[in-house]
């Protein structure tokens, strides 16, 4: 809100200050380019293309000052390339019953309080464990639980042989 207001006020003040048509045309072109750049950057927020071996870091800053807080990590993959997620010791889908324990190297399916948990083999097609994270190769959108009581960084690395395109976002509520 403040950025838009500053943009409009400075534009009006500059137009009032410069009276020649050439100056006003230059100001109009520069502000139009700035507006196009701003809209383009807002529309592409959270969209990434990583070459093989490249990484991107996303910061999780939990709102621990709130009584009820949680963080989610939204990952929408546009292709079936493999990317590795590191930074958390346990990965799980939001409201899911399968937990990927990175430190223990175990995939656990929870059956609630009544039954005993079941250990699944590490041969899942879409998501599987590696020594320091989980590798995901699904196509589509998944929401992971990223709640923790301390800030940390999620690192996304392209471990495939081709470029990977995805959208990633951390939401702290």
Regions found by a protein language model. Give the residues of each.
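Internal/C-terminal transmembrane anchor helices
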Residues: 24-45
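Short, solvent-exposed mixed-charge patches
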Residues: 1, 172-173
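Alpha-helical transmembrane signal-anchor/signal-peptide segments
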Residues: 45-63
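Noncatalytic modules at the cell exterior or secretory-pathway interfaces
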Residues: 65-72, 145-160
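Membrane-embedded alpha-helical segments of integral membrane proteins
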Residues: 1-17
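Extracytoplasmic/periplasmic/luminal assembly and interaction segments
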Residues: 62-121
């Amino acid at each position: 809100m403040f950025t838009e207001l500053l943009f409009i006020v400075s534009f009006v003040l500059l137009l009032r200050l410069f009276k020649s048509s050439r100056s006003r045309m230059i100001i109009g072109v520069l502000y139009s380019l700035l507006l196009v750049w701003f809209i383009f950057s807002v529309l592409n927020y959270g969209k990434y293309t990583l070459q093989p071996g490249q990484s991107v870091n996303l910061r999780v800053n939990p709102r621990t000052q709130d009584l009820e807080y949680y963080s989610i990590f939204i990952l929408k993959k546009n292709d079936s390339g493999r990317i590795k997620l590191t930074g958390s010791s346990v990965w799980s889908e939001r409201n899911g019953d399968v937990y990927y324990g990175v430190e223990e190297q175990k995939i656990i399916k929870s059956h609630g309080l009544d039954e005993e948990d079941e250990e699944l083999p590490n041969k899942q097609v879409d998501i599987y464990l590696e020594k320091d994270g989980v590798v995901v190769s699904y196509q589509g959108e998944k929401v992971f639980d990223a709640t923790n009581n301390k800030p940390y960084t999620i690192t996304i690395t392209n471990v495939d042989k081709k470029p990977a395109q995805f959208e990633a976002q951390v939401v702290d509520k």
